[in-house]
């Protein structure tokens, strides 16, 4: 990832609408899934970036401890400081963790990264999770939506729901829930991609307060729909809750 993009993320992820929406949706789905999981052990934020999610995980993990893993040493240090939690520097392709030690695993916009081998990362996640443990994956949707932010964070792939379900099933995971999100704003996203330049500025930035509030409200509506079991049929992102089989 470009260093400047890490710095942007660190600066705005506590207040930007997209990050707040992702954290709220992840916490909602994770809390519900963990409540029905037999697996104990800490919850790992694998590829935790600069720590925005790790900071907010506490209420969602049902008394479990939380830890982070981040490949970039600077981001790992920023995450540890921001979240006040242990953060190891390492790769999701080969995690420095014992087998069966985790009760939960978060992978938020990680399998899309050019430095990550999805099959290898999922094999490692399966190894480190206990039987029945919960994994939550968030991924950018649709290859044709690659953006300036994708390029700056070295994302090289985006996914469809079918691709993710097949990938997870092939590596020992049972999908419990899946939904696209960022659906109501999808027409704006599509328009932005169609008219934007390849060298456009990053999507990660502060937005005018009124616009941030409007976008946040759209995500809150989607979150309420997902909470009652409605799977959204398309969107800019895809979130999947799975359990480790075996």
Please report, for each region that a protein language model flagged, where it lies by residue.
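Feature marks short, surface-exposed loop/turn motifs that line or immediately flank catalytic pockets
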Residues: 75, 143-145, 184
